[in-house]
From Swiss-Prot:
Lineage, highest ranks first: Bacteria, Pseudomonadati, Pseudomonadota, Gammaproteobacteria, Vibrionales
Keyword annotations of the record: Cell membrane, Membrane, Sugar transport, Transmembrane, Transmembrane helix, Transport
GO molecular function: identical protein binding
Gene source species: Vibrio sp. (strain N418)
Localization per record: Cell membrane
Protein name as it appears in the record: Sugar transporter SemiSWEET
Gene Ontology CC terms: membrane; plasma membrane
Quaternary organization: Homodimer.
Length: 97
């Protein structure tokens, strides 16, 4: 087994954890949007969060197709977080781009 294959195999469990942690970085944005009820939504780009959602959805589908939880688990969680951002932006701003 080549060195890169051994490294990749060893990183697999860590990358699954990172895939779960990474989308959680959206939590402060969601908190500001839904809980603190600040004017924060006015500074957010609906287009950006729609693109994040679309990209995460594609990665989720790709990961499911390849039966690779390292790809689909984190991206599925990210997709849900990003959709929550999209809904919040639309609800609080009427959908500014």
């Amino acid at each position: 087994m080549a060195l890169i294959e051994r490294i990749g195999k060893a990183l697999e469990p860590l990358m699954l954890v990172m895939g779960l942690i990474s989308p959680l970085a959206t939590m402060p944005q969601l908190y500001k949007l839904y809980v603190s009820h600040s004017e924060h939504a006015l500074g957010l780009s609906l287009t950006t969060w729609l693109l994040y959602s679309f990209i995460a959805l594609l990665w989720t589908i790709y990961g499911i197709y390849h039966k690779n939880p390292t790809i689909w688990v984190g991206n599925c969680l990210g997709f849900l977080m990003y959709v929550a951002m999209v809904v919040g932006i639309i609800a609080h701003t009427g959908g500014t781009y």
